[in-house]
UniProtKB/Swiss-Prot annotation:
Molecular-function GO term, any one: ATP binding
Gene: fruK
Annotated signal peptide: none
Family: Belongs to the carbohydrate kinase PfkB family.
Keywords of this entry: ATP-binding, Kinase, Nucleotide-binding, Transferase
Species this chain originates from: Mycoplasma pneumoniae (strain ATCC 29342 / M129 / Subtype 1) (Mycoplasmoides pneumoniae)
Name of the featured protein: Putative 1-phosphofructokinase
Length: 300
């Protein structure tokens, strides 16, 4: 059974250094450690959940990444990338963020085999194993194979157009796409769907045991193959950057489930923390004071 004693493992294929720049030069540039898995681990730690993040890092930017990560005291296991760790630029223009993402580093097959060997030696059947980010498809296939062989609690938040084919009938414990990703995955011929059509698509989606879908400023959906819950978003105090909001939603939701909260309670906390992330640069951390606000929810 999945519970607070379950170890959390996060495979973040290619972490990054996020460089926030103000287009109007009203504030200095800010460097933060980035990557979906890093963001998740930071917010999960706020609830006493300490994941281990596995990633690939390459010089000359590896050392800078590790220096930026040090204040968060995360458990990180890195494997060698042949080329440098990415630097992604987040250009801020009022409430708008333009992202200029560097190319994914080159990762040799030997390094992937080393990561797989580490997972096989450490992941237990009741552990939670999260794969997130963008993978080279060759490596994603291998990591999916090993993930499903090690634990029944596999969580996927990956950017892969052919994910359904790669799953090959295997059912993750949870998937977390955003609305656009979900619609493209199940209804590729028509990306323009209204809420009624979206609800029907969700209820027909049997690829995963649980679906957590973020819908931007509208809120989030959770479907467990029996009930479909919709939680309205909390309006952020201010719009600074949406970077990391989806990672926060997933990380906080999982952390609260591990602490034995029900899905409604877990999602309430998660949408509050996602809103707080939008109100600042990078994700919320231990320096932030989060006041939980009531939010509306209903079953569809």
């Amino acid at each position: 059974m999945l519970n607070h004693n379950s170890k959390v493992w996060i495979v973040n294929y290619a972490c990054a250094i996020d460089y926030y720049l103000d287009k109007h030069k009203q504030q200095r540039g800010v460097l933060t450690p980035g990557g979906k898995g890093i963001n998740m681990a930071i917010v999960m730690a706020l609830f006493g959940i300490k994941p281990t993040v596995l990633t690939f890092l390459g010089q000359p930017t590896k050392d800078l990444f590790l220096q930026l990560l040090k204040p968060y005291q995360l458990d990180l296991v890195s494997f060698p990338a042949t080329t440098q760790t990415r630097i992604n630029v987040k250009l801020l223009d009022g409430a708008q963020t333009t992202e200029i993402n560097d190319v994914t580093p080159l990762i040799e097959e030997q390094a992937v085999h080393e990561m797989i060997a580490y997972l096989k030696a450490n992941v237990k059947p009741n552990d939670l194993l999260v794969l997130n980010g963008r993978f080279l498809q060759r490596d994603l296939v291998k990591l999916l194979d090993v993930a499903f062989s090690l634990t029944k609690y596999v969580v996927l938040d990956v950017d892969e157009p052919q994910l359904l084919q790669l799953l090959n009938q295997r059912q993750p414990w949870l998937m977390k796409p955003n609305r656009d990703e979900f619609v493209a995955m199940v209804n590729a011929n028509n990306s323009n769907v209204d809420q009624q059509e979206l609800v029907q698509l969700i209820k027909q989606f049997q690829t995963t045991q649980n679906l957590l879908m973020s819908d931007g400023a509208q809120g989030a959906y959770f479907f467990d193959q029996q009930q479909l819950l919709f939680m309205e978003a909390i309006p952020p105090q201010q719009l600074v950057s949406t970077t990391g909001a989806g990672d926060t939603l997933l990380g906080v939701f999982l952390a609260n489930l591990l602490l034995d909260k029900d899905p409604v309670g877990s999602l309430k906390v998660a949408v509050n923390y996602a809103s707080a992330t939008i109100s600042k640069l990078a994700v919320v951390n231990s320096n932030d004071q989060i006041v939980l606000k009531a939010t509306n929810y209903y079953y569809l």
